[in-house]
Each structure stands twice: as structure tokens, then as C-alpha cells.
UniProtKB/Swiss-Prot annotation:
Name of the molecule in the record: Ras and Rab interactor 1
KW Membrane (keyword) present: yes
Domain of life: Eukaryota
Organism: Homo sapiens
Pro residues composition bias: residue spans: 257-269
Pfam families given in the database record: RA (PF00788), RIN1 (PF23268), VPS9 (PF02204)
Lineage of the organism: Eukaryota, Metazoa, Chordata, Craniata, Vertebrata
Subcellular location field: Cytoplasm; Membrane; Cytoplasm, Cytoskeleton
Residue ranges of domain Ras-associating in the record: 624-706
Amino acid sequence: MESPGESGAGSPGAPSPSSFTTGHLAREKPAQDPLYDVPNASGGQAGGPQRPGRVVSLRERLLLTRPVWLQLQANAAAALHMLRTEPPGTFLVRKSNTRQCQALCMRLPEASGPSFVSSHYILESPGGVSLEGSELMFPDLVQLICAYCHTRDILLLPLQLPRAIHHAATHKELEAISHLGIEFWSSSLNIKAQRGPAGGPVLPQLKARSPQELDQGTGAALCFFNPLFPGDLGPTKREKFKRSFKVRVSTETSSPLSPPAVPPPPVPVLPGAVPSQTERLPPCQLLRRESSVGYRVPAGSGPSLPPMPSLQEVDCGSPSSSEEEGVPGSRGSPATSPHLGRRRPLLRSMSAAFCSLLAPERQVGRAAAALMQDRHTAAGQLVQDLLTQVRAGPEPQELQGIRQALSRARAMLSAELGPEKLLSPKRLEHVLEKSLHCSVLKPLRPILAARLRRRLAADGSLGRLAEGLRLARAQGPGAFGSHLSLPSPVELEQVRQKLLQLLRTYSPSAQVKRLLQACKLLYMALRTQEGEGAGADEFLPLLSLVLAHCDLPELLLEAEYMSELLEPSLLTGEGGYYLTSLSASLALLSGLGQAHTLPLSPVQELRRSLSLWEQRRLPATHCFQHLLRVAYQDPSSGCTSKTLAVPPEASIATLNQLCATKFRVTQPNTFGLFLYKEQGYHRLPPGALAHRLPTTGYLVYRRAEWPETQGAVTEEEGSGQSEARSRGEEQGCQGDGDAGVKASPRDIREQSETTAEGGQGQAQEGPAQPGEPEAEGSRAAEE
């Protein structure tokens, strides 16, 4: 497909200056004016030469194919029809039929329920867009779709692009799909993509070569490149060696593997080496493959070749490679033990397999760190602004704000990074969380710890804990009402070392890991004393006793640090349980120093600690104190009730208008607010305050012409409010009598029968005393 005005412009070999300028501007501003890779008549691309091997990002795929997945004219039935044959996770966005917003429709698995399509409303606000029920907010719809392609959050499973869009390699193919619009869902292109098998990337096959070909290489060795990342090589030889783990397989019958004289590449040939004997071996004995690893060193005897490099010399991505010690032996020396030499090939084979699996995580971590350093990206701007804001000064609920920012940044990073990293969504979230801790919490750790220490020292928490630790050491197990004894000195020192590691760690997840290790050591010591039947009732006193002898008041800071910054999903698991146990134990120790106060039992202290923690997590109580529940009586629809948010100083007149709006009353002048109390309705004056009414009644919004005695409720209650004598009340209620009418028992019984289904229906009220003239006048007026 040619763009108008582009065919025939310039020679076939050289693009015109105008097309070059257009392509340059398009590369400068891809987000504002995307230029598609449409070929011109010469076979080139109108948008300028595209870099070979360039991967189209997920955001570009969504932007170019917006007419396919954004169907604002489609209704719910059309969405069901288009998604009925699609694989689970396929989605489209339509306009809601019942609400003024857009809806995200997603195909569900067959066994998920009666409906195979779920709809989620997309809410728009000044801060961005978000799904209904989710706390994640994004700047635009495309960013939201990108994020939910990698993380499901409230969805049943992550979103998935149609296969034709996902496998498109160039902008030209995506533009061709975009031109189809809604017809893409029923086109042959989509059907062909569905019927075809879901093939993964074609990996390069290892080809067995003859001994003559192998001898042409340096040191008669075969190089095996890691096929997981064939196109991710760096510009230098050292970078190539880092990115592609090379394994040299010996062609001799015996090859004890030991550290080489010089790290490869290249592999030097040792002087005086015995000539290769592979020419006398059949090719089938050259290399025996295993399906689990991919290579195996043949057994036998023969001269040794230059040894393999150790894992420490190869940057294979193992997280523990920098912490392990080197392989014993000097350079160029053979293995010191024949038994160790026989085991090394298998160990190195297993290590190579693990390194290949861990390499994607290192790549994701490096990519996430680069994005967080770049202010031009959404995640980078959020992270850098967060660092600047925290360093500027303390704020209320600072740790909770940091945790929310980390969750938002993780969703943005998940949307930025493509799915080609060979990581599952759950593993991707774990790697991104770890990268965020390194980029955000590591530099902020000293600042946050100093602020926590100042705050806890100012309110006396640290002082009370230090005094409680001293008393617990002096009193022993009797301070907690327990007969348990301390673990052995060796076990106590092991627990102390784990707690010291916890204090030196900046990541909350790593701190919880150290806490679990310490608690495991304590459980082992507890079972040694009490047997297998020991439980939480014995564990909490033992934990408090061990903490007292470790004498680490700084654990109070770390308990709050972990509780606020730990990922919310981890708080409900084993880590959250033992973190709560640590907080309860510290609270129990802090209470020992208070004079004339008996220490609570472990169970009571645990409940109190949980209550305090929930108070920090839940919103304040005053947020719910401005709510009033009003019942609505109507002859046609019966009785309904609603909870209304009323300002503190709102009057009854304001509440009347609010009720008329909420209950959709067509004639609000004929309705009024009444207080149902003592089997009677009392008309409320317009000037009374809504939040200062008697609490022993029910607010009812009903027709004002129903029978009632004249007057104001304030006279019966004796409050003496001046609003009862206002002009508006005199117009609404003629007379100065009682404002409430007492219903007869028969009428009350009839009313209870009409309102038996959950509401107060229309009440046919009679006079309390038939002989009273005011009641008879009211009945006559009603007739």
C-alpha cells in the first residue's frame, strides 16, 4: 500500500529529502505523530530506513491497532459475538450501554463460569483512568491496557492481544491490520492465526561436526551459545561472552575439567600438548547428548585439554556467584582429586542450566533500573519525584505513601517491559519489586530509619522497650508466665545473627525472610524442649525471652518499616503472621516497664497489637459519622431506604432537597421529612439541624398531606427551638398543637402488615382519641 504523493518521488535507490525529513521528525516524536512503515514504490520504507531487528513494543502495537480493539459503536451482544471464538484473555473496549463510561470486555476460559465474557467499567477522573474496583491509575487507556497485559490485578487473567497483532513484526503489517477495523475479527487473517499452532521461537539446532571440523577451532573445542537470547549480544567480545554462555565440550575420551590457564576467549593451546586423537574416533562417540541439559562429556581416559573456566569467571547471572569462593587450585593446574574431576562436568552442566534460567531475570532487572533512572518515562518520573519528595521532608503517613507509589511504579514498569523476557507474570512482579527496592528503598533507607527513630524516641516507645528488655532479662521466663528456658548459647547466637542481618537489610521482603529464618530456629529449639506439640502459646513467650537477651531495641523500627512497606499480598501469608508475632512480642516487652500494670497474656497482647495495626491500616472513624439513613414511603412502590452523606451543619430543608434528588421525586413540594417515634410521625421543621435530631427515632421521607397533627416536633420534645414558630412552619402546619399524631393499635397493625417485606409501607393512620376535635378535623381534611 502506497501513501499518496510518495510513489515515484525520487530515484529507486535514494529516498527524497522530504521523505527523509518526514522520517526524521517521526522518529523524534513517535508518540505525537507515529509514522507507519509503509513501503514506497522502490521497495523501501517511506518512514526512513528502520533499524534491522527492531522489536515493536506493546504500546506501539496498541496504538497502531486501535481501530481493532477500540469498538465504541459495539454493544454487549456484538462484543460477545466477536469474542466467542477467541482464546482466553482476548479483549476489546466498547461503550457501556447503561453508564456513561467505557467497558473492557475480556474472553474468559470455558470452565470459569456460565458467561465466557467479563466486563469491567473503565472510570475516568482528573488523575487518569482506572478499572472499577482497582486502586491502580494510569494516564491514558493505552497505558492501562499495557499494564493489564502483564499483570491481572482484579482480572481473572492477563489481557492478550490477538495472535495476528502479537506476531506482526513491522509497522506495515500492523497498519494493514488496523485498516480492517471491526472486520478484522471475522477476517481470514484472524481465523488463520487461530487455526495455526501456537509455535514458539525457532531455536538454533546443534549440528554435529566431524573431528576435522572440530580440530580447526582453537584448542579443539566446541562452543555452545545460549539459544535463549540469540540477538542480545553486545558490541565487544567480552560483552558477547557475558551474554552468551559458552560451554566447551572436550573431544577427547577423557577430559578432567579444571580452571583454565587464561580465561577465554580465546583458549590458548598449551605448549607440548599431545596431538588430537579425535580423527580415530567415530562421530557418534564424539558427543552424547542428554535431553535435560543438551550436552555431556564422554567418559574414558586420555590426555587432558585446556580446562573449562569456572563459574566465577563467567558472568552467567547466578545471584550467588559473587559470594562463593573460587575453585581451589592455581591457574593451569589439574584437578587435585580424580573424584572431584569426575563430578565437575555434571555440576557445571546443572549450573549452566540454572544460569540460562536466571539470565532473563537479570535482564529484566537491568531494564527496570534503566527505566527508573530515565525521567522521560512514566515510571522514571514517578520514582525520581518520589525520591525528591521524601528527601525534602517528612510527611504524615509517609511509609504508606511510599508503598502506594511502589505499587504504581511496578504496574508502569510491567507495562513498559515486553513479554519477550520469558518470565511468568508472577515472577515478573517479584523481579520488579526487587528492582524497586534497590532503586527506591536502598537510597532512602537511612533517611526513613532516622525519622522513625526520632519519632519513636519522641513518644517514648524506644525508652519503654529498652526498660522492658532490661526487666525481662532480670526476671527471666517468669516475666511472661512461662516455664520455658532459653535455647542453648549456640542457638541463641544463631538467632541473634539472623536478627542483625535483618537490621542491616533495606528490602522489606528480605527482612521478612531473615525473620522467618530466625523463627524457624526458635521453633526447632522449642520442639527440643516441648516436643512436637508445641504451638503459638509457647512460641510467643519464647520469642519475647530471646528478644530480651538479644537486646535489640531497633527491632521496633524494623517492625513498623516492614509492616508499612511490605507488599500487601505478603502480609496475608506466613511472613505476615510472624511479622505480627514480632510486633506483639515487642508490645509485650514494652508493657513490662509500666508501673502498676499487670502484663497481658500473650493472646490478649496479640489481639491488642492486631487492633492497633488495623487502626493504622483502616480509614479514620470520623469519615463515617456524617451519614444518615432515610426511609422513603410511596403508595406505588412501598418503602425503600438509602444512606445519605449529609454535611455537619446541614438543615432539614437541605436534607429535603437531597432526598428529593436521591429518591427522584417529581413533586418535592408535596413531600416532607418526618421523625417516626413512639408509633407516631412528627413533622420536622425546615430550620432544624439534621445531625441534632433525637436518636430514638427513624427518619421517613413521605407525602406531607398524610394525616398528622399540627405543630412542630420541637414543642413535643421540649427543646424550645425558635424554628417551630417560623413562618414556613406555620404555612406547612396550620395550628399550634402537637406535631405528631398517635396511631391506633389497629392502624399500626395494618401498617406493619403492609411493610412486612423490609420497609415501612404506606401507613393508614387514625386518631389517637376519636373524641378530639383536632383529630376529627384532620380526618375530614384528608377525606
